């Protein structure tokens, strides 16, 4: 089996063909500009904000005296907390 035949056999699988149909061969009008691509990017940003916000809220303490300490705890003691905080920003 050649490489070309392997590629086509993968596209005939139900999951691969569905992804190909909805992501690659998506029917769109020809008069769309490149601004059309910013919709999915905004959606990805929204999902990242929601997911990181939920994880940050698990470690945050909304009290006047403890808020700064909880942010320091997130940055220093939580595994990957610095990454969560900067991804959320």
Curated annotation (Swiss-Prot):
GO terms for molecular function: electron transfer activity; metal ion binding; oxidoreductase activity. It comes from Brassica napus. InterPro entries: Cyt_b/b6_N, Cytb/b6-like_sf, Di-haem_cyt_TM. It is found in: Mitochondrion inner membrane. One of its GO terms (cellular component) is mitochondrial inner membrane. This is Cytochrome b. One of its GO terms (biological process) is respiratory electron transport chain. Keywords: Electron transport, Heme, Iron, Membrane, Metal-binding, Mitochondrion, Mitochondrion inner membrane, Respiratory chain, Transmembrane, Transmembrane helix, Transport. Belongs to the cytochrome b family. It is a multi-pass membrane protein. The main subunits of complex b-c1 are: cytochrome b, cytochrome c1 and the Rieske protein. The chain crosses the membrane at residues 38-58, 82-89. Pfam families: Cytochrome_B. Its cofactor is heme b. The lineage of its organism: Eukaryota, Viridiplantae, Streptophyta, Embryophyta, Tracheophyta.
